[in-house]
Amino acid sequence: GWLRKIGKKIERVGQHTRDATIQVLGIAQQAANVAATAR
């Protein structure tokens, strides 16, 4: 039904959000490491 379709869509968006968050955290971690090294 349409309810399951919406659930799938939300699931996919959630997956993208989690991937993006993980990427951002990784970049932030690298930036912190660079800042610590530069100091």
Curated annotation (Swiss-Prot):
Pfam families in UniProt: Cecropin
Family statement: Belongs to the cecropin family.
PROSITE patterns according to UniProt: CECROPIN (PS00268)
GO cellular component: extracellular space
Function: Sarcotoxins, which are potent bactericidal proteins, are produced in response to injury. They are cytotoxic to both Gram-positive and Gram-negative bacteria.
PANTHER family: CECROPIN-A1-RELATED
Keyword annotations of the record: Amidation, Antibiotic, Antimicrobial, Immunity, Innate immunity, Secreted
Protein name (record): Sarcotoxin-1C
Subcellular location: Secreted
Any one of the GO BP annotations: innate immune response
Major place of residence: secreted
Keyword flag Secreted: yes
Lineage of the species this protein comes from: Eukaryota, Metazoa, Ecdysozoa, Arthropoda, Hexapoda
InterPro entries linked: Cecropin, Cecropin_insect
Positions where Arginine amide occurs in the chain: R39
Species of the source: Sarcophaga peregrina
